[in-house]
Amino acid sequence: TDFAPSAKAFQEEAQKRIRELHMYDVLRADRCISVNSLEARVPFGDLDFVKYVMAIDPEMKLNKYGKGKYLLRHAFEKGDYLPHDILWREKAAFSDAVGHSMVDYLKEYAETVYTQEEFEEKRAKYTHAQPFTKESLLYREIFEKYYPGQSQMIVDFWMPNKSWEGCNVNDPSARVLANYGDSGK
């Protein structure tokens, strides 16, 4: 949302993301954690907290300070909740917690699985949520193997809002966006 062209667009995108969150990161985290008999604690997922944050004037949430998540960081400035270098460190992509090497390895592996001709041919058979990279085709074929004909369960790809300047990318990772910092490299 750092790239939102207006407060209204920011709020609309935030509302859309919240409506769809259960289908992306929340579902993935729940499944990955539950399979190991663990339970996730998600303090920023508290419904009262989410309602509170969504009620804040979106104009205040725009990135006017050159630092993403400014209001959240500012809220933790007073007191000793977090060390200063942690509180103000560069922004990192949530999905990169698995490590850059694993993400890069999967992309490289997908490139070896399909020729460009095979990619074009195989992706064309999917009319809903059509794969747009060899990596996304690899994931789609794995999904279809275990859940054939169930693709309608997936609304769409979790991607930046491509209509916003700086967000027309073909990778769901925030690593490809200009506001992504050096954290985690």
Positions of the model-derived regions?
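Phosphate/ATP-binding catalytic cores across multiple sugar-kinase/actin-like superfamilies
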Residues: 146, 150, 154
